[in-house]
Amino acid sequence: MATVDRWLLPDGIEEVLPPEAARIEVVRRQMLDLFQRWGYAFVVTPHIEFLESLLTGAGQDLDLRTLKVTDPLSGRLIGFRADITPQVARIDAHTLRREGPCRLCYAGSVLHAKPRALSTSRSPIQLGAELYGDASPASDVEVISLMLEVLEQVAVPDVHMDLGHVGIYRGLARAAGLSGEVEQRLFDALQRKAVDEVEVLTAVLPTAQAAMLRALAELCGGREVLDLAQACLVDAPAEVHAALDELIAIADSLGVRYPELPLYFDLSELRGYNYHTGVVFAAFVPGVGQSIAQGGRYDDIGADFGRARPATGFSTDLKTLVTLGQVAPAEPVVGIWAPDSHDVYLWQMVQRLRRQGERVVQALPGQRIDAARAGGCDRQLLLSDGQWQVVPLAL
C-alpha cells in the first residue's frame, strides 16, 4: 500500500481538527442545555444494532442510507445508525414505557451509506428532540418553536420555513382508491411538480377527485395558500379537512410567536411520506439547496415496538449549524507551563491549579521552555524562594 493511501479517508468522511472541533462541542453543549431548559431529557443510543431493530418502523429511504455489515459474533446483519430518531422512538415505546407526554433529545454521529446530497458529509452529527404521547397541534408547535430556537441560538441568518401535511395527499389518495403503484407514481409526479403527469395519472378518476389531486401541485406559496386550499378541497373527505385544520392551527400559532418568520406552504411536499403521518416542516436559508433542519409528525412508529404513541420531532446537523451560523471562535487556548520535575510540591501545585480550572501542561523529558508557546501557554511555574509560583511566560 502506498503511503498516500494510508491517510486517505472514504468519500464524505472527514476529520474535524481542534479549532473546529472545539466550536462544535461548544454548540453541542449549548443545544443540550437549551433542550434541558425546555424539559427534554438526554438519551444516548447505540452506534450499531441488528438490522431488524434498527430499521423497524422506518421507511425504505432509511434502509438505503444504512451501511450494513455482518456481525462476526452472531453472523447476523448489523447496521450503523443513519438516523437516531427511530432508536429514540423505541426507547420511549419499549424501554421507558411512560404514560403521558415524554420529551427526549439526543446528539450523536450517524453514518450514511451515501451522502444526502452532492458534496455533503456522510458522517453528520445529528442533533434532535422528540415529543411523544400527545397528538395535538400544540406538540408540533412546540417542537417547531424549539427548532427555531436552536437556529436562533447559533444565529443562522435569513431562515424561512416550509410547512406541509402528508395527511392531505394520503386522504385524497385513499378516497380515490388508487392502487399502490399509481399512488407511488402520482406521489413522484407531485414531488416534481410535473403537472402534465399528474393530469394523466388522474384522468381515470371522477372529475371532483381528479381536480382535488391536481390542485395539490399548484397549492404552494404564502399564507393565502391555506385559504385557497379550503376552497379547492371543499368536497374532500373529513380526514383531509382535519389535516388542513391542523396545518392552519399550527401556522396561526407560529405566526403569533414568530411574526417576522417567512412561512411557505406546499401541500404537495410529501417529504418522508412513508414515514410521517401529519405535519412536515423544514428550515431553509438562501444559497443552500437543502433543508438545514427538518421534522414532522410520525404517530405510527411506536406500534412496531409494541406501543403506538403519538410522536413529533425534528433533527439537524451540528456541523451544518456551525458552518452556517455565526458561532464565535473558541476562546484562545492559554495555560500554564510546568517544568519536567519530580518535585512533589510541584505536583501538588499543578493538581491544585487544574482543580481550579486552569489548563496546565507538564513538560516531558527533554522539552525546553520554547515548547511552552507551541503548547498554548502564556504563563509558567517557577520555583522562587522555595515556593512554586505562577509567573508570565518569558522566552
From Swiss-Prot:
The organism's place on the tree of life at top rank:
Bacteria
Its cellular-component GO annotations read: cytoplasm
Which pathway? Amino-acid biosynthesis; L-histidine biosynthesis; L-histidine from 5-phospho-alpha-D-ribose 1-diphosphate: step 1/9
Q: Does the keyword Phosphoprotein apply?
A: no
Task: Quote the subcellular location field of this record.
Answer: Cytoplasm
Query: What InterPro entries does the record point to?
Result: aa-tRNA-synth_II/BPL/LPL, HisRS-like_core, HisRS/HisZ, HisZ
Q: Which GO terms describe its biological process?
A: L-histidine biosynthetic process
- Keyword line: Amino-acid biosynthesis, Cytoplasm, Histidine biosynthesis
Q: Tell me if Amino-acid biosynthesis is a UniProt keyword of this record.
A: yes
What the protein does?
Answer: Required for the first step of histidine biosynthesis. May allow the feedback regulation of ATP phosphoribosyltransferase activity by histidine.
Q: Which family does it belong to?
A: Belongs to the class-II aminoacyl-tRNA synthetase family. HisZ subfamily.
The record's note on quaternary structure and interaction partners says: Heteromultimer composed of HisG and HisZ subunits.
Family annotation (NCBIfam families):
hisZ_biosyn_reg (TIGR00443), PRK12292.1-1 (NF008935), PRK12292.1-4 (NF008937), PRK12421.1 (NF009086)
Q: What else is known?
A: This function is generally fulfilled by the C-terminal part of HisG, which is missing in some bacteria such as this one.
Protein name, UniProt field? ATP phosphoribosyltransferase regulatory subunit
Q: Please state the gene responsible for encoding this protein.
A: hisZ
